[in-house]
Amino acid sequence: MSHISVGQPWTLVSCQESADDSSWMWTHPCGAVLSARLRQSDEVELIAGITMPPGIDTAEMTVPGPIWIPDDPLPAAVWAAGAHGLVVTRTCRDEHPALMVWRQDMGDSCAVDEGVSLLGSEIALAPGNSRLALWRGRLTDDIGEALGSLPAWLPAETIVDQPEEMVCHTPDAGILVDGAEHTSETIGPLPVGAHDLAIYESRGATRVLIGWSPDRATAVGARVDEILSGFDPRTVTGPQMWLLMSAVGMRVAPFSALEMAVEGLENVLSRPFGSADDHVARLLTCCAAFRLGHRMSDPELRDEGLRRLWELSLDEPGTFMSRCIASAELATLVPEHVWVNVVSGEGEDPLVRAERAIWTGRCASRDADEAVWELGAFLPTVPGGPLYAQGHRVSRRRAALAHAMTTVWPEELTSSFGSPRVGELRQRTLRRLLVSEHLDDEDLALLTW
């Protein structure tokens, strides 16, 4: 399901809803009229328009634009970039997953926290002016059909590794990169981080987030340098100690960092976890403790990590795969509980079901596919993240968890959504998260899983 949201001071004056055709109308104190319609026939259409009637005795006014909110429980993938846009929602048809591909034919879209701003967050209107957004949707079983609706000039990858270049074939369009005119179809390499690409065509401007990603070891090494420079075992966190342990394995931190990590973990584990503590932070603390305790021949640290891990809820994503790893590495030491064949509960987090399917060897299952979808890597990225569910943007933490869960998914295999290989999707997610302005220690740690 989807709905249209408008801000104050719009007032709803008409609402007609049915299974096949729904329409709404709002008025603004300045005299502007906003209408929206969702119509289902051979294709599904979403139309939204704003009009300032002629003869209104007012100068140009700015009014809030309408926001399309995909509020389905299953995450929708969004690429809203100005003159072009694509949204892929998920539905169920005859007990088989299906995709609804929404293509923007008119409008000036952008991704906001609630969903898709159809005409911009603020719209300037003079008497006699109007603005129109039109999206058309169709069902498909293959994400490849959605990708075929992307602009032909769009680079194959919008976030790449250093020192790669990207190519934007736009013979009849103007190009701006970070606000400066660009005369070549080849872009980059640019400094590490996110950049703005704007393409000006007759239909309008398309704004694309592009980026150059650091490699994972470089990102981890930079963060670990910060941790070591101000190291205090009384204030460090479990995820930070995981990063220290990982950095030594990546050879971007000295071996002495392991001893510091042990000291930090002993301090963290000297206190019980609080009810307000982040689940992933607790998870990483436990895993760092049992792994580091085993490596450093510290049975007390190892056993405390295992004990705490087995106390964590299996209803939270990440617990199951952590127990799998512990059981594989320390088979004779883990607590003797029956837990591998736990049955999925009603209303359980789909990511938990995906984790259980993947880590019990059922990658070719509908449950496992959920982790592939939550990588958020099928469409080009947008600022803030590309997935939306139940009226809000899905957090980066979910993508980082999905990246960790799919570590054991054979890279050459695909999913039921279509042809992109899971290994390629995981790399896209990794690059997207690494170019984020600020990546939490928990998220960065999950990327080293």
Regions found by a protein language model. Give the residues of each.
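Extended, loop-rich substrate-binding clefts of extracytoplasmic carbohydrate-active enzymes
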Residues: 1-49, 111-120
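Acidic (Asp/Glu-rich), glycine- and aromatic
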Residues: 25-32, 39-82, 206
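Beta-strand-rich recognition/accessory modules
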Residues: 29, 61, 66, 86-160, ...
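Terminal, non-catalytic domain-edge segments
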Residues: 143-160, 360-449
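Low-complexity, Pro/Ser/Thr- and charge-rich linker/hinge segments at domain boundaries
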Residues: 144-165, 206-239
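Non-catalytic terminal regions with compositionally biased, polar/charged low complexity
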Residues: 151, 166-171, 177-178
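Extended acidic/polar, glycine-enriched regions
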Residues: 172-219
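Catalytic cores of extracellular degradative/oxidative enzymes
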Residues: 219-395, 401-410
